[in-house]
Each structure stands twice: as structure tokens, then as C-alpha cells.
């Protein structure tokens, strides 16, 4: 599996008890020169991605192509998995992508595709594919993509000239991007029927966009002590303005580059903003412990006038768990002659049982809470004979680099 990118060597890694990204790892540099943890000694972003891609290719090429491999990538590592998926001809792989900058609609590498930032060596490589080798339309998903609303690496505005939306996404990188395992509670955010999550399927990929309760724009005010009810009241009208930087009717799997002009009805925009003011007042009163005196209803995660999210359903991945993944049709493409990676890759056929698809009613049976990655990965190792301690899974499967710092991309 692969973890998030910069600040420390990268990992393609697996949950192993308390350290949510420990376990058998495919190590790579994870650099974002010159601002990552190794500073001037780190690889550039582009070099780091290529290194991780080569090493992942070596590891997977050494495995039995008839067995299913589960790989997880967080941030830069999700980019590596996206590139690998685009290049490989091997099937039998389940991908879990967390905060993926290559998310087709929202990922910053997709918004500004086709360019390379010179000196820093950051190729804006474009969207992750939404098909897999051997996969055909109508078959069960092979890929699960999780992103927080307003995380600027994975949910960047479609209309970046909306200054509020862009500033909000940049602050989302600061306040959201490095904290998925502590902010996103899978027992609620990914639970069937979860109102806080928008779940959509495009091609072979199920996308989960987890709603953010407070705009990142307001987080600095929260840090300096502005009362939370006041911030909650401000969120509703501000969210209407921020959401004008997006088009939430597009699927996260629909490739969408940044656009200059937004064509919209200004009367509708103004009406939504005005309606959001009393909603915000009621939200603030409710946050302070009072009734909603103006009688308004709470808006969804996309704000007043925004589309309603499609919550996850109870049957996510059940067919995938019951069936074999598609067989590889030809050998893996990548060069496998470079340095070996330590440790075996585990295989699994029941990973997706815990991941909901769009559409069914909620279940009332709570699951023990672990971190986001713990919960996503644990099911991937249930059938691998992994040891357990104190009820926590101790799996051992593929990963990419050493996880020490969780904030940078």
C-alpha cells in the first residue's frame, strides 16, 4: 500500500495495529523538494513519483497474477497508484485512493493537466483512469476513492477565479489534508446512509466525498477564539459563495479541467445567498443550544441551493467480495530489474465488503471505531491469516515508504 507523500519517505503500506500505516512497505523517497522533510536532499516530486512507480511495479510483478492484491495510496502515493493503474495490464488489483491529487474532477493534477512546474519538477499529470485491465462496464468496482470536501489537493475548485473558493481549498490543504485518520470517522462518514457523504460510481471507481462541517476559511478564526456558534452562522452564506467555484452536478470521476468563466443565473445565485442567511442564523442558534427560531431547515453539505448528496449504501462491494477479480490478460509492463523491495504482498478477495456503494438504507449495527485507513484496510486482510491484538487487526500487505509527517502533500 502507499501512504501520503511528502515530509518523510513515502510508503505503500498497510495498517498494523496502532501505527495506521505500518506493516510491510514498498519504500520510496516521498519527496517534495525542497520543502519536504529531507529538504535539499530529497528527490523532486516528479522523481519521487517515478521512483515509487518503479518500486511498486517490481513488487506487484513478483506476485501471483491470479491472486488479488489490495493497494492503498494517500496523497502523493495515490498519484503513484493512479499512474500505475493507467500503465499496467494486470488485473486482480483493488485500489484504495485517499486524498488523490489525480481525482478526475477535483484533483489539482487534473484541474491543471498538461503542464509541468519548472525547477520544482511537478508534472501536472492529469486524471486517474476509471477503468481497469479486464474490467467491463456493469461489473463490480475495483477502485475506491475517498476525499474530504474542500481538501485542496483532491477537491480543488473548477472555477479557480472564484477567490473565496480557491482560498478555501488552499486552507483545506492546511487543515484537512494531513488529518484523514483523525478527522474522518468511517463509522459515520462511510456508513450506509451517511448524510455527510456523497457517494457516486463512475466507471470502475466508487467515489466518496466526505462533507466538511466548517469551511476551512473559518478555521483561522476558530483558532483565535471566535465562538463556534458565530462561525457556524457565517458558514451557510459563505458556503453558497464558495460552492459557486464548483459544479457538483459533475461526477468526481468525470474528467474536468479548470475553467475560466462560470455561466450561471445571477438571480439564482443571489437568491441562494439571501436564503442562506436565516439558515445560518438558525444553525448558529442550534450550535449554541437553542431552537431554530426562524424555522429553516439545515442545508446539505453543498449548501443552500446545492444538490443533495447521494449517501453510501449497505451493499457496497458485496459482489466484488464474492467474486474473483478479472484475470490479468498480459504480463505487467513495468521494468522489474531494479532493487528488490522487502516483504511479501498479501492477497485478499473480501476487501470491499466494508465499503458502501451509492444508494441503500442505513444499517443500525455500529462498528468499532478505528482510523479511516485502519477501517478501509482491515477488511482487506481478514482472509490473510493476519494476527490480531486487543481486537485490532495486524495485517501485513504492500505499502510505499516511511510515514512520519502527515501534513504535506
What does each model-identified segment do?
Residues 77-78:
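Catalytic nucleophile loop
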Residues 1-74, 83-409:
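Composition-driven, intrinsically disordered low-complexity tracts enriched in small residues
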Amino acid at each position: 500500500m502507499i501512504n501520503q507523500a511528502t515530509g518523510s519517505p513515502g510508503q505503500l503500506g498497510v495498517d498494523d495495529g496502532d501505527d495506521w500505516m505500518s506493516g510491510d512497505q514498498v519504500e520510496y523517497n516521498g519527496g517534495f523538494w525542497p520543502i519536504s522533510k529531507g529538504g535539499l536532499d530529497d528527490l523532486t516530486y516528479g522523481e519521487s513519483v517515478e521512483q515509487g512507480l518503479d518500486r511498486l511495479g517490481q513488487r506487484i510483478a513478483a506476485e501471483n497474477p491470479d491472486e488479488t492484491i489490495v493497494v492503498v495510496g494517500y496523497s502523493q502515493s495515490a498519484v503513484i497508484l493512479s499512474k500505475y493503474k493507467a500503465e499496467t495490464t494486470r488485473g486482480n488489483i483493488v485500489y484504495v485512493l485517499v486524498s488523490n491529487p489525480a481525482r478526475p474532477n477535483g484533483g489539482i493534477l487534473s484541474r491543471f493537466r498538461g503542464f509541468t512546474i519548472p525547477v520544482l519538477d511537478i508534472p501536472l499529470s492529469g486524471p486517474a483512469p476509471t477503468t481497469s485491465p479486464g474490467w467491463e462496464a456493469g461489473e463490480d468496482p475495483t477502485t475506491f476513492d475517498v476525499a474530504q470536501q474542500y481538501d485542496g489537493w483532491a477537491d480543488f475548485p473548477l472555477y479557480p477565479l472564484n477567490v473565496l473558493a480557491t482560498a478555501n481549498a488552499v486552507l483545506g490543504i492546511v487543515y484537512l489534508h494531513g488529518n484523514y485518520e483523525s478527522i474522518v470517522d468511517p463509522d459515520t462518514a462511510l456508513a450506509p446512509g451517511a448524510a455527510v457523504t456523497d457517494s457516486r460510481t463512475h466507471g470502475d471507481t466508487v467515489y466518496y466525498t466526505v462533507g466538511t462541517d466548517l469551511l476551512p476559511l473559518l478555521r483561522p478564526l476558530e483558532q483565535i477564539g471566535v465562538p463556534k456558534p458565530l462561525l457556524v452562522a457565517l458558514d451557510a452564506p459563505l458556503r453558497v459563495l464558495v460552492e459557486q467555484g464548483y459544479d457538483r452536478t459533475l461526477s468526481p470521476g468525470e474528467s474536468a479541467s479548470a475553467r475560466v468563466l462560470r455561466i450561471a443565473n445571477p438571480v439564482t445565485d443571489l437568491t441562494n445567498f439571501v436564503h442562506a442567511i436565516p439558515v445560518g442564523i438558525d444553525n448558529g442558534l442550534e450550535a449554541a443550544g437553542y431552537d431554530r427560531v426562524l424555522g429553516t431547515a439545515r442545508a446539505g453539505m453543498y449548501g443552500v441551493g446545492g444538490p443533495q448528496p447521494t449517501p453510501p449504501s449497505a451493499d457496497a462491494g458485496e459482489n466484488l467480495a464474492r467474486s474473483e477479480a478479472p484475470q490479468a490478460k498480459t504480463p505487467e509492463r513495468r521494468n522489474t530489474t531494479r532493487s528488490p523491495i522487502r516483504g511479501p504482498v498479501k492477497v485478499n478477495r473480501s476487501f470491499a465488503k466494508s465499503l458502501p456503494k451509492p444508494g441503500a438504507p442505513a444499517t443500525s449495527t455500529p462498528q468499532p471505531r478505528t482510523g479511516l485507513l485502519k477501517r478501509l484496510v482491515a477488511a482487506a486482510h481478514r482472509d490473510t491469516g493476519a494476527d490480531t491484538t486487543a481486537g485490532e487487526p495486524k495485517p501485513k500487505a504492500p505499502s510505499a515508504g516511511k510515514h512520519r509527517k502527515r501534513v504535506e502533500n
